[in-house]
Amino acid sequence: TYNILNTSNINWGVYGNASFIKNKINELHPDLNGKMIDGTRVYEEGYSMYRMYLAEWAGVDPETGLALYWSKDTDGNLVKTSDYQVAQANHKVATDDLLPTVYGGFGTNVEAYGFDFSVQLAYQLGGKIYDSGYSRLMHGGTSSFAGNNWHKDIYKAWTPENTKTDVPRLNANDRYANSTSTRFIISSDYLSLNNITLGYTLPKTVLDRVGISRVRVYCTADNVALWTKRKGLDPRQSFTSATTARYTPIRTVSGGINVAF
């Protein structure tokens, strides 16, 4: 907290905080030989416990529009394949630490000539998240997703006229268009405007005439805005793995009058 200005009529202060996160697996059970894979998670000595273990996205085949994934041939060379099951069996990669490097908040408070104004923000930097909500909205039109909506990015899907794209073609027979992979790992950095409040306290000289000690009129807005890597992504749902299709806190605007006798 720091006071920028403090006079008889004006008081202006700012504040902020930052928390840094580090973690490392020091030792696993000897039978695990320093590493354990549990579905889409990997635990390895010397590394963060918050890492995912996924098939590696290789883009879109410009000739066919099929989703591609990195795999390995019999000689151990990296090759691209449209068969997700082959990629799953032969080549998966560990992500970097999903946890943010730093998170915290900051804001300001101003009081001047009876008015008071405050702004509160929060932030997160340096982390990653699996955007499962986005992945579900980028399906290829298979029957298992019948009735599901699409993200607007689906307009970028491969067509014979649009071959330079990272969005696979729309085809009801393509089971692997949005399979779990590094394709949907995205930055979890965010800046959120949590609160704005504006108030006015009536002068005491006015209130003394009616026997009231204090009256303050105010208006406040909560959950005002959120800025992230992708519109619609809310990394605040989880900082250890994936988004969970929860509703973002609703934006509210309210006002009131505080009266003290």
Predicted regions and their residues:
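Membrane-embedded beta-strand positions in outer-membrane beta-barrel channels/transporters
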Residues: 1, 13-15, 105-107, 195-199, ...
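Conserved small-residue
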Residues: 3-98, 129, 138
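Transmembrane beta-strands of outer-membrane beta-barrel pores
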Residues: 4, 18-24, 112-114, 123-127, ...
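Repeated loop/turn-to-beta-strand initiation elements of outer-membrane beta-barrel proteins
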Residues: 8, 114-119, 205-206
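Residues that define the transmembrane beta-barrel architecture of outer-membrane proteins
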Residues: 10, 100-104, 189-194, 249-253
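Membrane-embedded beta-strand positions of outer-membrane beta-barrel proteins
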Residues: 14-16, 119, 217-219, 257
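C-terminal beta-signal and terminal closure region of outer-membrane beta-barrel proteins
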Residues: 39-65, 142, 149, 154-162, ...
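Extracytoplasmic gating/loop element in the C-terminal half of outer-membrane beta-barrel translocons
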Residues: 124-216
